[in-house]
């Protein structure tokens, strides 16, 4: 397995590099950064090698400048984490125009070098996923973003804590924008296979408070420690494992939709997808209730507006 991380010197990129390097499937890990970050990346490589000492990992780690991307050839997955980081008080959409130029540049270069899968992490992730898809001209199954996968995990944890059950008993997800217009799917939430609405405590569930906490978790972490890294890195690892092991799990990622949800088209947005060796094998259409459809359509319209603005940058 060969994985490339573009933007590996950043918080999420470096944390992801460590987690991936520890995996037994990892053979070649390529860390890409701008020229001024090469020393930091070389230090990261040596630090990771120290962490791997005495483990079963035999990953080869390579460091290269983004001026020489030929090294990414034959990568199974290219992860893009590059971009201007979000600061406290800054919305994800504020980042769109600046980061679109960065992501678009890399997407074009990747497409020139290899036929691979592009996994976008850069925020606002739905808009950046669309930009990477448009500029790479890859098939829709090859380009996807982290989307609301981490948001869904945070929501799952909150539900488990409220009902006092093991997290594995909870099945739920959040769709839509990775941002303010995200949509929790209570209609598709269950505990131990039982619809959540059938539990007596459901009427006490502070759903608005929980969703607000999920929405602002990233900003909370930025305020407390400068930025998140471990949560996103673990979520990224989940997705890469699905690809490597051809797990065909249903994850909520940012994917291009073409009418699967209420006729919405030409936008990348967080939806349930079946993910395996070929990337997105299927955008899984599910039945939403009336309020969820309205909220999802609103979310798609918000993303689409920004996609149109950055499409030709």
Curated annotation (Swiss-Prot):
Q: Which GO terms describe its cellular component?
A: cytoplasm
Query: Where does this protein reside within or beyond the cell?
Result: Cytoplasm
Which cysteines are cross-linked by disulfides?
none
UniProt EC number: 1.1.1.375
Offer one example of a GO biological process linked to this entry.
Answer: tricarboxylic acid cycle
Please write the reaction equations for the catalytic activity of this protein: a (2S)-2-hydroxycarboxylate + NAD(+) = a 2-oxocarboxylate + NADH + H(+); a (2S)-2-hydroxycarboxylate + NADP(+) = a 2-oxocarboxylate + NADPH + H(+)
Which residues of the sequence carry a binding annotation for NADP(+)? 7-13, 34-37, 99, 121-123
Molecular function GO terms recorded: L-2-hydroxycarboxylate dehydrogenase (NAD+) activity; L-lactate dehydrogenase activity
Keywords assigned: Cytoplasm, NAD, NADP, Oxidoreductase, Tricarboxylic acid cycle
The record places the active site at 178 (proton acceptor)
Q: What class of enzyme is it?
A: oxidoreductase
Q: Where does substrate bind?
A: 86, 92, 123, 154
SUPFAM superfamilies given in the database record: LDH C-terminal domain-like, NAD(P)-binding Rossmann-fold domains
What the entry lists under InterPro entries is as follows: L-lactate/malate_DH, L-lactate_DH_AS, Lactate/malate_DH_C, Lactate/malate_DH_N, Lactate_DH/Glyco_Ohase_4_C, NAD(P)-bd_dom_sf
Taxonomically, the superkingdom here is Archaea
What's its job?
A: Catalyzes the reversible oxidation of (S)-malate and (S)-sulfolactate to oxaloacetate and sulfopyruvate, respectively. Can use both NADH and NADPH, although activity is higher with NADPH. Oxidation of (S)-sulfolactate is observed only in the presence of NADP(+). Can also oxidize tartrate. Cannot reduce pyruvate, nor alpha-ketoglutarate.
NCBIfam families in UniProt: PRK06223.1
**To which protein family does this belong?**
Belongs to the LDH/MDH superfamily.
The entry describes its oligomerization and partners as:
Homotetramer.
Indicate what this protein is called per its UniProt record. L-2-hydroxycarboxylate dehydrogenase (NAD(P)(+))
